[in-house]
From Swiss-Prot:
Effect the entry attributes to changing residue 242 to A: Abolishes editing activity against valine, with little change in aminoacylation activity
Residues that, per the record, bind Zn(2+): 901, 904, 921, 924
Positions with a binding annotation for L-isoleucyl-5'-AMP: 561
Subunit structure, interactors included: Monomer.
Protein name in the entry: Isoleucine--tRNA ligase
Record note on what altering residue 787 to L does: In strain: MRE-600; AA sequence
Compartment annotation: Cytoplasm
UniProt lineage: Bacteria, Pseudomonadati, Pseudomonadota, Gammaproteobacteria, Enterobacterales
GO biological process: isoleucyl-tRNA aminoacylation; response to antibiotic
Native species: Escherichia coli (strain K12)
Recorded GO MF terms: aminoacyl-tRNA deacylase activity; ATP binding; isoleucine-tRNA ligase activity; tRNA binding; zinc ion binding
């Protein structure tokens, strides 16, 4: 028997079947770095229209976690897809380097500034620590396959950036948005510093919930208001609070002007409460026998005075819109030094902003004899006992409620009035302008707009000053006596900025005021405060984007971060940009959800459900992590677990196998010489290229809309359904058995070449390592890297006007599916082994029959059977299988007649008819020794 194996065009490629990504990717990264791939891309894209994705700086502390990976991978997918779409899309990664977490780390190791080290030495240690953290995170980000200017990232602690942050503040001051005030701010007693809103987290806390009676100063005036004369005992207005420790700072009681307030007689006294809450309050304080003596509107009680239960002064009733009927009594204890609402209403009524609490959270001397020096949270019980002793406590119980805590210490924080610097939301219309700017931004998902609008509409003035060591100095001089800013503040800030640009922030602390103030130095003092770190990152649109040469003065097109950044970076950037320039710093804002485990639980070391990106890369490779990110809908929570990553690895194998099949069958194909013109190609091959064209349209649309899970789904459908289960199956016969240089085979290879050129580019933004690997095995002249080019433009399809158009092949796909069902059943019944042992007869109604007949003898190649006949639908025998999908089709199967050809495996009647090739069929003889078979359709 002759060996015909050598006459077959068997697939062959050096592209490995197994990805072995964890082993191969580091080598590719080394090549990318040695070649300066990022620089090559920049050179290739020079002069193109720009798309700038501005990197929100992660904090330079600790190792990267799965959330960081999601964020950086999403950014990288966008930057690479924009590059392929013809944009110059530079990516400059950044880090947030100042602030409390770094101070705390340095304190743990070296002690607080001023203990073992001077403040200057402490700052140097902080800078050193941040630099090591940046290096560690940078290695991991690079390992993810993220391309960017990693050699020249921006750091908020770069001297030039520090200087530009000071300049940003100067611009805001110049535009009239800064003011100073003793306002209640979030204060952490452990940090001994004010906190930004974004540094506050909420946890459940148990507090005493108390109802307290404030006795009326003028009892008769109240009786007159309620039009009653018979009242048994004193009259009091009752407040409810869960922060008894704030009562020493009480300066008023707020009531709602439009609520009805009832005078209620209880045992031995009368109390005033919101009428709608009488029943719930009576229940709470355990009173069953009570009488409502009268009611008035809250507005009637304005400015009546009530005695503080233990502080020895009286306080007014005032009117406030913040009073609700959700809980309590309808009368709100008001301490302007301990709450933003209280402060606002206190300003309106000219109340004292009393703050009896020191920075360490203990009462200042002279507050009250039993409270001086006591921690406020320990004081609750003392205050409750005091109220009981004075007969003012109506009720006390323990209550669990959501309470603001420090994001770093996880300990409860307080509102505390301290002298601070604020960016005003309203004195120069910043709130109104910001709300206007929000409307001009595209928010993805679109619910982001309502979220940030509500935050901007309701937020207080932004406290930008901090009492910290490691931060950008505010660089202000204020008059010793008046505390007014120096009249040449902007000029002086620029002078400081120039020095900081050379020597870093230490230049401010080293600065002797005389150097720039001269004789005025004795009248002014340096403000010791540093800027909130959210000011650092929030001003990067100015300190980084406006000055980096690769951005060429263009504003950022996109900011992309986790959904917690509406109140964080998106907010601070919007505030600063609008205050500086009157406009938003971004055109699009995209947010992604948080990572959770397979059961939807938050990642937590204590639960042990965290997924380490480093582990995933070391076991499965970065491309699997990237594919998981892309295939997950980032608009909600992003679930990740070993099982979910295993599914991503399965999808990866399907894509890799498709790419490998294409490469293996392009063996010996030179596009410069062997390409077949579209009009000369086999129709099925043109259909396949058309499938790629349709897929590309969908994929590019999805990339444009940032719907990466749609990209992956469409890519999978193309690989699995259109190619894997139809086209690639059909062409194996022609590809392997046709004459090597025949039009039949070269047509097929031409299609595979076009498909591979498109596929490798679709993959590149997501499966960057694998795309680079595939690129290296593709035939033909090309640039060194897939990332420097654009989407493939060589695709074409069938015209609708052709008889065998897309609709024709869609119907053929259905016919093939129906035939497969019949073959599967026959295999199960042991009637045939493989599909080539079968011959089928298709009983079709006229319209379908005409289509099937048009394929002639090539119909059997589409159906993967050795024989295929078309007959009239009405002639179908009883055992023919009726199609469920195509009503005008029945399928009958019989065992193929003739012998099996050992070369092509088809069963035919003409095996051995040619003496020189007695073992193979006539078609194979033609392909081995003759002119080769001709194919028109399939």
């Amino acid at each position: 028997m002759s060996d015909y194996k050598s006459t077959l065009n068997l697939p062959e490629t050096g592209f490995p079947m197994r990805g072995d990504l964890a082993k191969r990717e580091p080598g590719m990264l080394a090549r990318w770095t040695d070649d300066d791939l990022y620089g090559i891309i920049r050179a290739a894209k020079k002069g193109k229209k720009t798309f700038i994705l501005h990197d929100g700086p992660p904090y330079a502390n600790g190792s990267i976690h799965i959330g960081h990976s999601v964020n950086k991978i999403l950014k990288d997918i966008i930057v690479k897809s924009k590059g392929l779409s013809g944009y110059d899309s530079p990516y400059v990664p950044g880090w947030d380097c100042h602030g409390l977490p770094i101070e705390l780390k340095v304190e743990q190791e070296y002690g607080k500034p001023g203990e073992k080290f001077t403040a200057a030495e402490f700052r140097a240690k902080c800078r050193e620590y941040a630099a090591t953290q940046v290096d560690g995170q940078r290695k991991d980000f690079i390992r993810l396959g993220v391309l960017g200017d990693w050699s020249h990232p921006y750091l908020t602690m770069d001297f030039k950036t520090e200087a530009n942050i000071i300049r940003a503040l100067g611009k805001i001051i110049g535009n009239g948005h800064l003011h100073k005030g003793a306002k209640p701010v979030h204060w952490c007693v452990d940090c001994r510093s004010a906190l930004a809103e974004a540094e506050v987290e909420y946890y459940d806390k148990t507090s005493p919930s108390i109802d307290v009676a404030f006795q009326a100063v003028d009892q008769d005036a109240l009786k007159a208001k309620f039009a009653v004369s018979n009242v048994n005992g004193p009259i009091s207005l009752v407040i409810w609070t869960t922060t008894p420790w704030t009562l020493p700072a009480n300066r008023a009681i707020s009531i709602a002007p439009d609520f009805d307030y009832a005078l209620v007689q209880i045992d031995g006294q009368a109390v005033i409460l919101a009428k709608d809450l009488v029943e719930s309050v009576m229940q709470r304080i355990g009173v069953t026998d009570y009488t409502i003596l009268g009611t008035v509107k809250g507005a009637e009680l304005e400015l009546l005075r009530f005695t503080h239960p233990f502080m020895g002064f009286d306080v007014p009733a005032i009117l406030g819109d913040h009073v609700t009927l959700d809980a309590g009594t309808g009368a709100v204890h008001t301490a302007p030094g301990h709450g933003p609402d209280d402060y606002v209403i206190g300003q309106k009524y000219g109340l004292e902003t009393a703050n009896p609490v020191g920075p360490d959270g203990t009462y200042l001397p002279g507050t009250y004899p039993t409270l001086d020096g006591v921690n406020v949270f320990k004081a609750n019980d003392i205050v409750v006992a005091l109220l009981q002793e004075k007969g003012a406590l109506l009720h006390v119980e323990k209550m669990q409620h959501s309470y603001p805590c420090c994001w770093r210490h996880k300990t409860p924080i307080i509102f505390r009035a301290t002298p601070q610097w604020f960016v005003s939301m309203d004195q120069k219309g910043l709130r109104a302008q910001s709300l206007k700017e929000i409307k001009g931004v595209q928010w993805i998902p679109d619910w982001g707009q309502a979220r940030i609008e509500s935050m901007v509409a309701n937020r207080p003035d932004w406290c930008i000053s901090r009492q910290r060591t490691w931060g950008v100095p505010m660089s202000l001089f204020v008059h010793k006596d008046t505390e007014e800013l120096h009249p040449r503040t902007l000029e002086l800030m620029e002078e400081v900025a120039k020095r900081v640009e050379v020597d870093g922030i230490q230049a401010w602390w080293d600065l002797d005021a005389k150097e720039i103030l001269g004789d005025e130095a004795d009248q002014y003092v340096k403000v010791p405060d540093t800027l909130d770190v959210w000011f650092d990152s929030g001003s990067t649109h100015s300190s980084v984007v406006d000055v980096r040469p690769e951005f060429a003065g263009h504003a950022a097109d996109m900011y992309l971060e986790g959904s917690d950044q509406h109140r964080g970076w998106f907010m601070s950037s919007l505030m600063i940009s609008t205050a500086m320039k009157g406009k938003a710093p971004y055109r699009q804002v995209l947010t992604h959800g948080f990572t959770v485990d397979g059961q939807g639980r938050k990642m937590s070391k204590s639960i042990g459900n965290t997924v380490s990106p480093q582990d995933v890369m070391n076991k499965l490779g970065a491309d699997i992590l990237r594919l998981w990110v892309a295939s997950t809908d980032y608009t909600g929570e992003m679930a990740v677990s070993d099982e979910i990553l295993k599914r991503a690895a399965d999808s990866y194998r399907r894509i890799r196998n498709t790419a490998r099949f294409l490469l293996a069958n392009l063996n010996g194909f030179d596009p410069a010489k062997d390409m077949v013109k579209p009009e000369e190609m086999v129709v099925l091959d043109r259909w396949a290229v058309g499938c790629a064209k349709a897929a590309q349209e969908d994929i590019l649309k999805a990339y444009e809309a940032y719907d990466f899970h749609e990209v992956v789904q469409r890519l999978m459908r193309f690989c699995s359904v259109e190619m894997g289960s139809f086209y690639l199956d059909i062409i194996k016969d022609r590809q392997y058995t046709a004459k090597a240089d025949s039009v039949a085979r070269r047509s097929c290879q031409t299609a595979l070449y076009h498909i591979a050129e498109a596929l490798v580019r679709w993959m590149a933004p997501i499966l960057s390592f694998t795309a680079d690997e595939v690129w290296g095995y593709l035939p033909g002249e090309r640039e060194k890297y897939v990332f420097t080019g654009e989407w493939y433009e060589g695709l074409f399809g069938l015209a609708d006007s052709e008889a065998m158009n897309d609709a024709f092949w869609d119907e053929l796909l259905k016919v093939r599916g129906e035939v497969n069902k019949v073959i599967e059943q026959a295999r199960a019944d042991k009637k045939v082994g493989g599909s080539l042992e079968a011959a089928v007869t298709l009983y079709a109604e006229p319209e379908l029959s005409a289509k099937l007949t048009a394929l002639g003898d090539e119909l059997r190649f589409v159906l993967l059977t050795s024989g295929a006949t078309v007959a009239d639908y009405n002639d179908a025998p009883a055992d023919a299988q009726q199609s469920e999908v195509l009503k005008g089709l029945k399928v009958a199967l019989s065992k193929a007649e003739g012998e099996k050809c050992p070369r092509c495996w088809h069963y035919t009647q003409d095996v051995g008819k040619v003496a020189e090739h007695a073992e193979i069929c006539g078609r194979c003889v033609s392909n081995v020794a003759g002119d080769g078979e001709k194919r028109k359709f399939a």
